[in-house]
Amino acid sequence: KVALISGSGGFDKSMHGECLKVAPKYGIEVVADETYGAADTDMTAQLTKIRASSAQAVLNAGFGQGPAIVTRNYRQVGLTLPLYQSHGVASKEYIKLSGPAAEGVRLPAAALLVPELLADKDPQKPIVTAYKRDYEARFKTDVSTFGGHAYDGLMLAVNAIKRAGSTDKAKVRDALESTRGYVGTGGVVNMSASDHMGLDLSAFLMLEVKNGNWSMVR
């Protein structure tokens, strides 16, 4: 039994809809379904309703600062159920904004956040280690997965143009759709004419906040 609390943005609504769609496939019952607005600064009313439900865990479908407010309010109303966030808050900024309340929160994220925790044989390790080092040296701030997405998008395009031997749109498109085994910061990309995302669930690691930092759930 799971409770949902979701924001009102496009990402939030999309995730909320997908959660409702897939929950029955995994035998999950959504027993509470609360929402909050983009300008809301207090979600204790929604969380108090969730506390009174029969939920065994809570999932926050949110992006931006909303999930940090949810996390702080979550502890304030005395909720002790497992709290899961989305990859939409996969950055150190979320931990900073949430403070000690973030301890124990879990969320799926790309390997870019935890290169030092990857096995040496992991194909992403050299890629994400170098990106994190170079990004933080250049910008003097913690790396986040969002910059990594932009980097991957650019490098996939460059790779496709090189393989196409041209900047002709149709040829570049065909080259992109034939991308196989591209190791990026967000995962190993395998595209096709029907799959322009190119990633599967192996692109995500389940992370947990411990002592104000990321740890891997094994």
Which residues fall in each region the model found?
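Extracytosolic ligand-binding ectodomains
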Residues: K1-R218
